[in-house]
């Protein structure tokens, strides 16, 4: 993955997947452990900032932006988890297309719901 290859929001997800591919054992330790008792994403300052940027860039209301982000993050984490467990072995270009398709589909649905 090259710097500037993707828009910033997509780049964060693609970097997460790239990290999983490059460092599968570390990824498992960091992101595939019991998280019981940890703050939920809605309580996290970084998540709140991301939601603000999504709202600004898409025109979505706060709840729709939050749901969009969480749905996308679950999708991204799912791909990364499937890569590190050997369940999937997809090329970056295929993953990029999938991420774009899901983002565009979710965004269109959120905008339709709030229209």
Which role does the model predict for each range below?
Residues 15-16, 23, 68, 83, ...:
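Short alpha-helical scaffold segments that flank and stabilize functional sites
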Residues 2, 33-36, 58-61, 88:
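A short, mixed-charge helix-start or loop-turn motif at secondary-structure junctions
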Residues 35-59, 66-70, 96-111:
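Amphipathic alpha-helical packing segments from all-alpha helical-bundle domains
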Residues 1-22, 62, 72:
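Hydrophobic alpha-helical connector segments
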Residues 18-25, 48, 52, 74-78:
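Generic structural signal for well-ordered, non-membrane alpha-helices
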Residues 26-29, 33, 74-91, 105-114:
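Amphipathic C-terminal alpha-helical segment
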Residues 5, 16, 26-27, 46, ...:
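Hydrophobic side chains within well-formed alpha-helices
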Residues 4, 48-49, 85-89:
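Juxtamembrane/interface motifs at transmembrane-helix termini
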